Regions:
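PLP-dependent class I/II
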Residues: 1-163
Length: 163
């Protein structure tokens, strides 16, 4: 659901970054849109996460925010990667537990996350055990859709034989 579809936006906070939109993970470029009191409260965290990005990040951010055309390409790229891996994982009994609007797959592995992740690592596939994200993440793994399409296809072939 879009925040624009919510009539009473009193408790709505929108975080928008270039991480997903433009595949600029790690640049920490984005914005928060919320009621003034919420934005004011969030400012207390600003010194902890930095005060201003480097100039090259600012320039790249301006270019990315100014160009909407590339966003469709980025979405299509992630969709192809998702469509390559997800059917294999579902066929092997894993359950998708996350949103479709992400550049990762959050999957219920039906058991402990670290041994599952270690098993995949032995075959060259790196996933994040859900336990790395806190106790509530136990039993899940995170497949980031950041490798190339060819690497996702190789991973799908490995997953078919390993799981």
């Amino acid at each position: 659901m879009s925040a624009l579809q919510v009539e009473d936006r009193t408790n709505v906070v929108v975080f928008n970054t270039l991480s997903k939109r433009s595949s600029m993970t790690g640049y920490r470029s984005g914005f928060v849109c919320a009621q003034p009191a919420v934005v004011s409260a969030l400012r207390s965290f600003r010194p902890s996460v930095g005060t201003a990005p480097q100039e090259f990040v600012q320039r790249a951010s301006v270019a990315a925010w100014s160009d909407d055309a590339h966003v469709d390409d980025v979405r299509a790229l992630y969709r192809r990667k998702r469509d390559t891996l997800l059917p294999v994982l579902l066929d092997k009994g894993l359950r998708l537990a996350g949103s479709e609007a992400t550049f990762y797959l959050w999957l219920d592995v039906g058991g402990r996350s670290e041994p599952f992740a270690r098993r995949l690592l032995e075959h060259g596939i790196v996933v994040a055990p859900g336990s790395f994200f806190g106790p509530a993440g136990e039993g899940y793994v995170r497949f980031a859709l950041v490798p190339t399409q060819a690497e996702c296809e190789r991973a799908a072939a490995i997953l078919r034989s390993v799981l």
